[in-house]
Amino acid sequence: MSNVVRIKAIPVSIGPLLFLPVTSLPALAHASERGHVLLLPTQYYALGGAAAVAFSFLVLVLLPPEPLLRFGARRLRIASPPFDGRATISFLSFLVFALLLYAGATGSRDPLANPLPLTVWTLVWVGLTLAHGLLGNLWAWLNPWYGPWRLAVRLGLPETGWLRLPDALAYRPVLLLFFAFAWFELVYPAPDDPARLAAAALAYWLFTFAGICLFGFAGWTSRMEFLSVFYRMLARLSVFEGRPTPKGFSLGLCPPGGKLVEAEPLPPSGVAFLLLALGSVSFDGFMRTFFWLGAIGVNPLEFPGRSTLMTENIFGLAVMTLTLAGAFALAVWTGERLVGGRDLKRAAGLLVWSIVPIALAYHFAHYLTALLVNGQYALAAMSDPFFRGWDLFGTAVPHVRAGVVLGAEAAWWIWNAQAAAIIGGHVLAVVLAHAIAFRLHGSARRAALGQLPITVLMVGYTVFGLWLLSTPTAG
């Protein structure tokens, strides 16, 4: 898309939602292919956000951390259903997945008319990811493997499989798989192509189901299925907490992030996994900025397409993630040096949990506009999944309208929602890092001193995130 809209009244970055005219919006099914708005400077938001994050740290330094830990440990049980329904829900999810694969292979070649790419990239990767931060580990019920696996177990498959994964693998397999997923999403030229996406999704389902049969469901999904690992980590931020019981499960409430403070330290590969999750969504925004395109010698007003930039983008994705990992490691090392700590591995494994609200905030801010627009395309595609002229739900309209988000006032709300998410995510991260640092060091003074470098990093990343939202983009 070559259109560039100039807004001179307000500082705003809203992606594909502001393409005029009002009648309909051209957009791609993949969230990363967003529209472009040239903006007025947003330095006031950046300065205000950085000040808010820094001020939250100063307030925490003045307050005793023990009440914060006690508050985070509070739990309130709200329900104890006599059954969990996991197998049934998962099997239904598998059937929906099979229908989506069929639609991808035989339906429309248009990514905006085929439900498979819209479901994968908008409803699942955007919507379901955000839901995990609010509602808990929904993937435990919605994954398309658990139901078929339970059926296979009833037919005689050993519940624990036949083999065991070496403990030394840790999170290395899912780290590689998540990087492959990020490559497919951000670098591969056609991640939205329905037929190619159907082939990739089917191959991954077969690979995962074979692993589950060989190594058992828990053994495989805890270290070899990247979505299960990623969603389980995000779910620790949720205010809902589910625990299995002999007759079903117990559902309770907890403070947001309370489960992150109590989490066990991640091994180095788990630390790298979380940092890759943040680095990939950050690069998704960075790769289309005029700054990045200029750095790799591309005129942003003559964007050549993803297929010509595969080498540069895979390099950029790796450098972004390694830079973030290096900055995090340096911050943890500096903090441990300040307090005389010696267990750098444990410190990094605990403090990295404070990154989770930042990763979720970036996910919300970066994909919000795509969710609002492409979610409408998804509703239309679901009414005619096989491109046969159906209108199952009365939503199969020829054009998706986005009048709901057009205009200066709507743009103002979108921008402020994005900025609030970035700032709020970093403030919560500072609070969690303070509680984790107290757990790590055992005294308020050592916790504040050890957390200081991490806070500096978070302040800097707040400014970077707000810059990503406001800087001109192309592609």
Task: Give a label for each model feature.
Residues 465-475:
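Juxtamembrane boundary at the C-terminal end of a transmembrane helix
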Residues 315-334, 348-371, 414-430, 458-462:
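C-terminal substrate/ligand-recognition segments
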Residues 430-458:
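Interfacial loop-to-transmembrane junctions
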Residues 281-290, 325-334, 358-394:
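Transmembrane alpha-helix/helix-exit interface in multi-pass inner-membrane proteins
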Residues 1-29:
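N-terminal secretory/membrane targeting signals
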Residues 32-48, 110-121, 258-261, 298-315, ...:
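Membrane-interface segments at the starts/ends of alpha-helical transmembrane spans
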Residues 221-333:
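Long, internal scaffold/assembly segments composed of regular secondary structure
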Residues 29-37, 44-255, 283-284:
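Transmembrane-helix bundle segments that line or gate the permeation/cavity pathway
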